Amino acid sequence: MAESMTAIDWTTEAQGVGQYADVNGLHLYYETHGEGRPLILLHGGLGSGEMFGPVIPALAAGHQVIAVDLQGHGRTADIDRPIDVRLMADDIAALIRHLGLEQADVVGYSLGGGVAFHTAVKSPELVRRLVMVSTNLRRSAIYPEMLAQQGQVRADAAAFMTDTPMYQLYQRVAPRPEDFGRLLDKIGASMAQDFDFTEDVRSLQVPTLVACADADMFPPSHAVEVFALLDGGQRDGGWIGEGRPKGGHALAILPGVTHYSIFSSPLLAEAVISFLSAQEAT
């Protein structure tokens, strides 16, 4: 898996303003770009807010983008707590309150999508709109070969990851670069836990965009499954959209990309901006 990651490019010309917020025992790093309605970005496992680099300029053109480094990732040091999307969701809710925001749009990718999902489930009053990118909501949705690869994520794999952007980013920005092995152990333990959050989908109270690659780490049918739980794909949409999902939910399957290259598609930013700009469902 490490060999396939060396070609990933998260570079961007965008220059943000970095700050820290002390929430839930974390010294949580976040970086702001642009002005406008607040938009929180939550990265994937072993990454940082820099994962969104290719799409930040487009998103920041009309929003105040707040790119967060989650627990133990990027510039946010780890604490004595498991890597758990439900706990990290509490961190994001606390950050929104810390920033004095009434509400924010929240976009999460992969691990960050799980964090975004639970933020919306647990604190719906704080989330205006939710976007989950390449996010599986049950472990069994992932292809078996990917589950096998996830089972190899542990500290002793660090030596084989030195050429990957995840390792190089961590060494460049982490408060304790020597903790990369510890992060691998904690991420590996998190991914080894069975989970199925699909029943929680029905409780979502905020408009939600489900987005994935057409060659993601799970089949597109899983995204369709989640969309169906949001009243999507149940009937013809009608001439004026009267048959679209109640609640303003949407689905986007992006062509020609994978779980790892999805940020390279200009369609990702377009889909997110279009969804966030849509009128509230009645």
Outline where the language-model segments fall.
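Active-site nucleophile elbow and catalytic-triad environment of alpha/beta-hydrolase enzymes
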Residues: 184-200
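Alpha/beta-hydrolase fold catalytic core
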Residues: 1-39, 62-63, 277-282
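Catalytic active-site module of serine/aspartate enzymes centered on a nucleophile-bearing elbow/loop
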Residues: 242-282
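Flexible "cap/lid" loop of the alpha/beta hydrolase fold
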Residues: 114-122, 128-167
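Conserved HGGG/HGGXW glycine-rich cap/lid loop of the alpha/beta-hydrolase fold
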Residues: 26-77
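Short beta-strand/loop motif that positions the catalytic acidic residue
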Residues: 204, 210-212
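Conserved alpha/beta-hydrolase "acid-adjacent" motif
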Residues: 217-223, 234
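Active-site loop/oxyanion-hole signature of alpha/beta-hydrolase fold enzymes
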Residues: 14, 67-107
